A protein has these predicted regions:
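Compositionally biased, charge-rich terminal segments
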Residues: 1-19
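Class I (Rossmann-like) S-adenosyl-L-methionine-dependent methyltransferase catalytic domain
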Residues: 9, 24-99, 106-155, 174-179, ...
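A conserved beta-strand element that flanks and buttresses the S-adenosyl-L-methionine
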Residues: 164
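ABC ATPase nucleotide-binding domain "signature" loop
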Residues: 171
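Short catalytic micro-motifs in class I SAM-dependent methyltransferases
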Residues: 167-168
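Local beta-strand N-terminus motif with an aromatic residue
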Residues: 97, 160-161
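A short glycine-rich, Lys/Arg-flanked "PGG" loop and its adjoining helix->strand segment in the class I
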Residues: 178-190
Length: 286
């Protein structure tokens, strides 16, 4: 299985380097649909110490090597520690969570751990990647919900005591991020917690690690963050996704101006998720 895992990933990366982007997207889409016809053993694999299998399309796991697997687990557990800290800061505990939304759940890097603390049927797995949502529903027992490019058009089945958004605002243009913030704030239950991560000012020093297209953009990012409070640059061919960095005081002031007195900030940790992304926890109080 390790050979298969590496072979599929290697072939995908090789094709991406040589194919025009539109053709690569077409081939990848056809492959992903074809995978649904294969036995489950070809789509996911169990690893020691990890609850549930990891899907072969879960690119949060760089490889099946032990170091990469340990990092995958550590990032998931770091999210859980931050979620628990946010709950406690809001005077809540896991037992108070009767409805949880993992928005941008992917293939369950965090959801698999949430399902250890919350009955899986009380967790909504939401992502624009429908295959990922189906996997989380089948593997962990979560309720599936397909997201849309326009977050405002998503119909949520209920209000939530806990909403977790890990590493999505980090990739959204500023206006789309604000749209999402308004949507998620609107589906919080009374005393519910919205816990999300962003790339804060500390990430200005690591732009080159996000890809070659960002290596020369540090001056523009620093100017935008200092002057406007946030700055975004797209990925090459990224269909509206990219890298966003937010200044802490600007984000806090924006949320308070838009949503007070309904929301209060109960917890903030700079670079709190995996020593990288800032963690924010806001609680609905009205």
């Amino acid at each position: 299985m390790t050979v298969l895992f590496r072979g599929v990933r290697g072939a995908r990366n090789a094709l991406k380097r040589v194919m025009p982007l539109a053709l690569y997207d077409l081939v990848r889409g056809l492959w992903r649909r074809a995978r649904l016809l294969l036995p489950a053993v070809f789509a996911a694999r169990a690893y020691p110490g990890v609850p549930g299998r990891i899907h072969n399309e879960d690119y949060m796991l760089a490889s099946p090597a032990q170091d990469d697997l340990q990092r995958y687990v550590a990032v998931g557990l770091s999210a859980m520690a931050n979620i628990e800290a946010g709950l406690h800061a809001g005077g809540r505990d896991w037992a108070d969570v009767t409805a949880c939304l993992d928005f941008a759940c992917g293939y369950g890097r965090v959801l698999r751990w949430l399902a250890q603390r919350i009955p899986p049927g009380q967790i909504t797995a939401c992502d624009i990647d429908r295959q990922a949502v189906r996997f989380c529903a089948a593997e962990f027992g979560a309720e599936p919900l397909f997201s849309l490019a326009d977050f405002r058009a998503v119909t949520f089945p209920r209000r939530y005591d806990l909403i977790w958004v890990g590493s999505l605002f980090t990739h959204l243009p500023i206006a789309r991020g604000r749209d999402l913030l308004a949507v998620l704030t609107g589906i919080l239950a009374p005393a519910g917690l919205l816990i999300f991560t962003i790339q804060g000012e500390s990430c200005l020093d690591r732009l080159a690690s996000y890809g070659p297209e960002f290596a020369g953009l540090e001056p523009a990012f620093r100017e935008g963050v200092a002057g406007d409070g946030a700055h975004f640059a797209p990925y090459r061919g990224g269909e509206g996704m990219g890298i966003a960095i937010h200044r802490r005081d600007h984000l806090r002031q924006y949320v308070q101006a838009q949503f007070a007195p309904s929301l209060r900030l109960v917890h903030f940790v700079p670079a709190g998720w995996d020593d990288h992304q800032d963690v924010w926890a806001w609680q609905r109080i009205a």
